C-alpha cells in the first residue's frame, strides 16, 4: 500500500518539502508520496482523524500551525514538550505523536557554518512557532545572551514565561549583538522588508534567516550590502527534514551536494 505524507501550512506555496521528501522517497525506493496542503484551522480535526484511520501516515507542520495543532494530539516527544512546538506528526501504538525536528535542524545548520556563536549574543526577530526551537538550540550551543523582538509584544512576553532568561526589546530597536535571526514570515513575499538600520549594524555581524524560499530575502540582501555575513534557512530545512524522514521511514537519508543543490530555486 502506498503511504501518504503531507506538509500543511497557510501559506504553503513556498514549501519545498515535497521536492525534498519525494527525492528521498524515490532514492530509497519507498512506496509513498508526499504532497503539500493549504490548510484552514477548521480542517485540523479531520486531518488528525485521517491519520488515526491511516489514510495519512505522517505530517509536517509549518506556519501557523506548530502550536495550534498540539491540543489535537495524544502525546508529545520530549523536544515537542519543552518547545511547545510540533513540526512532525506520526502514529505509533494507536497514538498520534507530535515531534519537533526544528531544534536539531537549526542546531546542526549552525554547527556546520564557520560561525562560532558560543558565548555570543543573539537577537531573534519573531515569536512564532519556530522561535522556541531556536531558543532551545541556541542554549544547547551555549549562547551567552538571547534578545527577542516581536511586532506583537504580548507574544514575546508569553514566550518569556517559558524562557525567563531571554530579554525582550521593542520592535525596531537596535542593540549590540553578534547574530540576528529572522524567525518571522517577513521575506516570503518579494516586497517584504524588515526595517532596521542595516548600515549601522551589519558589518561583520551574522544574519540568519529561517526562510529558504526565496533563497535571499531583502533582510539578507540588505545585510550583505553593508558587510554582514549571511545564511538562509536551507540547511536548517534539510536537517529537520532528514530527522522527520528517519522518524517515518527508519532511514537516515544522505545529505550530499545533490540534495543541497536540489533546493536551489
Swiss-Prot record:
Cellular component annotations (GO), alphabetically ordered: cytosol
Catalysis: reaction(s): shikimate + NADP(+) = 3-dehydroshikimate + NADPH + H(+)
GO molecular function: NADP binding; shikimate 3-dehydrogenase (NADP+) activity
Residues binding NADP(+): 78, 126-130, 150-155, 210, 233
Catalytic-site annotation from UniProt: 66 (proton acceptor)
Keyword entries, A-Z: Amino-acid biosynthesis, Aromatic amino acid biosynthesis, NADP, Oxidoreductase
Protein name: Shikimate dehydrogenase (NADP(+))
Amino acid at each position: 500500500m502506498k503511504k501518504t505524507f503531507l506538509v500543511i501550512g497557510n501559506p504553503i506555496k513556498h514549501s519545498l518539502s515535497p521536492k525534498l521528501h519525494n527525492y528521498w522517497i524515490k532514492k530509497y525506493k519507498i512506496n509513498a508520496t508526499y504532497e503539500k496542503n493549504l490548510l484552514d484551522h477548521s480542517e485540523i480535526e479531520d486531518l488528525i482523524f485521517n491519520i488515526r484511520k491511516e489514510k495519512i501516515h505522517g505530517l509536517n507542520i509549518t506556519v501557523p500551525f506548530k502550536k495550534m495543532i498540539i491540543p489535537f494530539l495524544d502525546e508529545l516527544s520530549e523536544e515537542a514538550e519543552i518547545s511547545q512546538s510540533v513540526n512532525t506528526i506520526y502514529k505509533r501504538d494507536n497514538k498520534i505523536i507530535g515531534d519537533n525536528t526544528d531544534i536539531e535542524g537549526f542546531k546542526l545548520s549552525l554547527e556546520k557554518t564557520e560561525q562560532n556563536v558560543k558565548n555570543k549574543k543573539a537577537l531573534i526577530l519573531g515569536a512564532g512557532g519556530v522561535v522556541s526551537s531556536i531558543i532551545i538550540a541556541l542554549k544547547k550551543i551555549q549562547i551567552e545572551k538571547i534578545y527577542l523582538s516581536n511586532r506583537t509584544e504580548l507574544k514575546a512576553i508569553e514566550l518569556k514565561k517559558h524562557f525567563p532568561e531571554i530579554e525582550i526589546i521593542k520592535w525596531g530597536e537596535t542593540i549590540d549583538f553578534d547574530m540576528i535571526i529572522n524567525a518571522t514570515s517577513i521575506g516570503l513575499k518579494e516586497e517584504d522588508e524588515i526595517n532596521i538600520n542595516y548600515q549601522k549594524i551589519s558589518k561583520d555581524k551574522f544574519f540568519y534567516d529561517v526562510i529558504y524560499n526565496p533563497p535571499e530575502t531583502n533582510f539578507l540582501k540588505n545585510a550583505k550590502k553593508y558587510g554582514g555575513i549571511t545564511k538562509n534557512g536551507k540547511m536548517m530545512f534539510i536537517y529537520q527534514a532528514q530527522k522527520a524522514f528517519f522518524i517515518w521511514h527508519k532511514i537516515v537519508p544522505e545529505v550530499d551536494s545533490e540534495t543541497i543543490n536540489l533546493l536551489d530555486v
